[in-house]
Amino acid sequence: MNFPGFAHDTRAGIHVVHGGIGYPVLLLHGFPQTHLTWRHVATSLAEDFSVVCPDLPGYGASAPPPDGHAKRTTAATMVAMMRDLGHDRFGIVGHDRGALVAFRAALDHPDVITHLGVLDVIPTLDNWAALTGTAGVFGFHLYLLAQPSDLPERMIAADPDTFFGHFLDNWAAQPIPSDIRATYLAGARTPEAIHAICEDYRASAFVDADHDQADRDAGRRLTMPVLAMWQDPGEVDLPFDPHQVWARWAPDLSTHVLPCGHFLPEERPEDVAAAIRTLFTR
């Protein structure tokens, strides 16, 4: 069992596992994964925290959202889910797509979100600005998945396991266990899941970027302690400095670079759990 001692629940169509006792922390997964990416970190944190790990709307066992995939909408859904679980204020940590939801929740609900952790991602607005010239090759999926329906859906449906498996295999410095990989693929290959994932990326290309731009124009910044972690790029020359990007949004920022691939919660769970614990001491 990947989450010993955790309860499995469904709240308003959102599949969620939760367990532990202590200050509440919400852990959000990325693409093309599910709550399982947090299995090691969550069980460690449950010694000191009330840990909540949902499948994002449209991912895994969670139903697609009725009101679209804007991160503002998903963030509000997560806040409502946590309130339904009895948590009016909490910390939030996200990886990849989940970090974008966490970022939006922290900007939109600063009275609710007390601590923010973001893993291996930069905000949507900054990401689009960085993907210029040949740098766009590394983020090709951002452009593909954001194309109008149903072009990418049809392309991916021709061989979804190869498509999603490409990211699971090539973004990881250490292989994802075969049973976990199979679960991710099973949750992503259905027509409903493929469409939901594409809608998630379409939102990032348009409405999410607009929301970020409006916040930047208004001078809004993150008011809580923020932890930003990312993989060591090694010999890859990133088209941006993650620390500089996040410092522009977060006055109270700490950063960590880990020697691993993209999937930090799976590849370096002990380091991630330790960093989260430190975040909550600030």
Where are these regions (language model features)?
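Flexible "cap/lid" subdomain of the alpha/beta-hydrolase fold that forms the substrate-access gate
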Residues: 2-10, 14-17, 24, 52, ...
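Conserved HGGG/HGGXW glycine-rich cap/lid loop of the alpha/beta-hydrolase fold
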Residues: 17-61
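A short, glycine- and basic residue-enriched loop/turn
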Residues: 34-35, 100, 261
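Alpha-helical elements of the RecA-like P-loop NTPase motor core of helicases
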Residues: 36-39, 195, 274
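Conserved strand-to-helix beginnings and helix N-cap segments that scaffold or border functional pockets
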Residues: 38-39, 239-240, 269-270
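Catalytic histidine-centered segment of alpha/beta-hydrolase-like enzymes
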Residues: 261-269, 273
